[in-house]
Amino acid sequence: MANVTVIGAQWGDEGKGKIVDWLADRADAVVRFQGGHNAGHTLVVDGTTYKLSLLPSGIVSGTLSIIGNGVVLDPWALKQEVEKLEGQGVTINDDNFAIADNCPLILPIHRDLDGLREAAAGTGKIGTTGRGIGPAYEDKVGRRAIRVCDLEHLDSLEPQLDRLCAHHDALRAGFEEPPVDRERLLGDLREIAPFVLRFAQPVWKRLKKVRKAGAKILFEGAQGVLLDVDHGTYPFVTSSNTVSGTAASGSGLGPGAAGFVLGIVKAYTTRVGSGPFPTELDDEIGQRLGERGHEFGTVTGRQRRVGWFDAVLVRQTCAISGVTGIALTKIDVLDGLDTVKICTGYRLNNNVYDYLPSHAASQAAVEPIYEEMEGWSESTAGARSFADLPANAVKYIQRIQELIECPVALVSTSPERDDTILMRDPFMD
């Protein structure tokens, strides 16, 4: 049996939470390997809605859930999320939850810097969630980060704080802000340390043991490949690598552990915040899709931008991330449309492109080339087999498969976990 790596193959918000939850029932461990609490998952299990932004989706079903070293961890946000889930009856303890002891922390000073920069950016805003993710990754790469393991050695933290605060004090001075309150920061860390340390361990070692026992591991990506710091629509991206290869470096297992790479893809396209969006719809159809799809961010509450399915982008993300098969979500949102469209190429300066150029100005200027297909009036909501789908919906799915050059493994027809059509079992591949 294979391990499975789940990634978003668009700009995030593709419905990864439902798919991961559906797969987590059969996994022995679920691992978050990048990002922070800036990307949310909404799970609906037996009529109960769970909103997660940091914890792996497997925690709801009691599966061993791990936050890997590739994640930047806000310990206060984690505590709040754990307490909220426990209030909903979810059991969280050191038997079913672990945090990498070499995981870098998001501190209040990171949130401060994030907000100051975005406020000063004016029209140049990149749409950050303001939760300190980017600045925390900067400190990680700059070798200034305070990590989970440091919480056990707070009495000897002064040299690290010197280096960290010298950097942030210089930045804060540029915004006419006072220096970091070191005593308050240290006090905050002392207060939160016992909560975090009860879950801290070398998770690479635990995962090695789990894998050696023949267990199935589910790697849960956050956001989407089009937000990858290298391969996304730069600079309108996140601060981490969101491609499947990060599952190795962000968990401590080798690249051979990734297994079946499942790319999650909406049957249309959405994006939160600024940045290029070739198929964006500003008309009544776009408004209808947004309303029917409840397109509001789990974390920020911001309304998502909506557009037609972009086969060019998904073909590109599937290639970059080595996607084995896709899970197509929210097909039911397209029910009732007379016509559906798929972007098959771009036009730019009298040239036709079968990929998205790297330069930001070119990305913003491309014009989509559409292929139109007949829609369907029948409902796809709740369908659990291909035979339950309208003929035109089947044709739409098959055409997507052809254009992105990657097979469809799953189709999701509602937020409910069991409303899923399985064509190819990722764990059996």
UniProtKB/Swiss-Prot annotation:
It comes from the Bacteria. GO terms for cellular component: cytoplasm. Its cofactor is Mg(2+). InterPro entries: Adenylosuccin_syn_GTP-bd, Adenylosuccin_syn_Lys_AS, Adenylosuccinate_synth_dom1, Adenylosuccinate_synth_dom2, Adenylosuccinate_synth_dom3, Adenylosuccinate_synthetase, P-loop_NTPase. Pathway: Purine metabolism; AMP biosynthesis via de novo pathway; AMP from IMP: step 1/2. Binds 1 Mg(2+) ion per subunit. GO terms for biological process: 'de novo' AMP biosynthetic process; IMP metabolic process. Mg(2+) binds at residues 13, 40. GTP binds at residues 12-18, 40-42, 304, 330-332, 412-414. The keyword GTP-binding applies. Substrate binds at residues 298-304. IMP binds at residues 13-16, 38-41, 129, 143, 223, 238, 302. Keywords: Cytoplasm, GTP-binding, Ligase, Magnesium, Metal-binding, Nucleotide-binding, Purine biosynthesis. The active site is at 13 (proton acceptor), 41 (proton donor). GO terms for molecular function: adenylosuccinate synthase activity; GTP binding; magnesium ion binding. It is an enzyme of class 6 (ligase). SUPFAM superfamilies: P-loop containing nucleoside triphosphate hydrolases. It is found in: Cytoplasm. It catalyses: IMP + L-aspartate + GTP = N(6)-(1,2-dicarboxyethyl)-AMP + GDP + phosphate + 2 H(+). Plays an important role in the de novo pathway of purine nucleotide biosynthesis. Catalyzes the first committed step in the biosynthesis of AMP from IMP. HAMAP family: Adenylosucc_synth (MF_00011). Belongs to the adenylosuccinate synthetase family. This is Adenylosuccinate synthetase. It comes from Erythrobacter litoralis (strain HTCC2594).
